[in-house]
Amino acid sequence: MFPKIKQTSKNYNGKEIQAISMRFSNQITILVTISGKIGQMYMMTYEKSVMSPVSITGDMSTLPEIGVRTLLGGGGEDDIKSHWAQITAGQVGSLLARQQMLVRPDVRIPRVCLGLHVPWTDDNEKNGDLTVVILELVKEICF
C-alpha cells in the first residue's frame, strides 16, 4: 500500500520552508525543512486512546496527554532552539489530535512523526512566529 502524500511550501523571512506529509494507515510522517535535510525528529504518542466521541472545548482540555520523544538531534538540554522544536512538536501533535477528534471522534488518533530542519534563532518572538508558520503548513498538508 502506498502512502497518501501531500506537499506545500511557504516563504518565511526570505527562506522557502517546504512541508510534506505521508500517511500510512495509522501513522503520519511530516517533514518541514528549508534544505531537504532533517535536523531533528520527534515522535508524538498519545497516553489515552480516543475511542468515543469527545466534546472539544476552546482550551483543548479534553485532548489526550501527548508525549513528545526526541528521535534525532535536539541539541543540549539548555539549547533554546531545541526547546522550541520540542514545543512545536507538541503543538503539531495537539493540532492533529484536535482535528482527528472533530472529524472522526470514533477513530483512534494516529501516531505522528515530525522531522524539522527550520531556521530557529535565539529570539523567542521570531521562534513563535516560525512555529505559527509551521502549524499553518501542517494544517494545509494534513487536512
UniProtKB/Swiss-Prot annotation:
Give me any GO biological process, just one.
proteasome assembly
GO cellular component terms, A-Z: cytoplasm; cytosol; nucleus
Location, primary (coarse class): cytoplasm
Q: Where in the cell is it found?
A: Cytoplasm; Nucleus
Instruction: Report whether Nucleus shows up as a keyword of the record.
Output: yes
Question: Domain of life of the organism in this record?
Answer: Eukaryota
Q: Which GO terms describe its molecular function?
A: protein folding chaperone
Please give the InterPro entries that the UniProt record associates with this protein: Proteasome_assmbl_chp_3, Psm_Assembly_Chaperone
Gene3D superfamilies for the chain: 3.30.230.90
Keyword annotations for this protein, in alphabetical order, are:
Cytoplasm, Nucleus
Keyword Nucleus in the entry? The reply is yes
Put simply, this protein is called Uncharacterized protein C16E9.19
Q: Which organism is it from?
A: Schizosaccharomyces pombe (strain 972 / ATCC 24843)
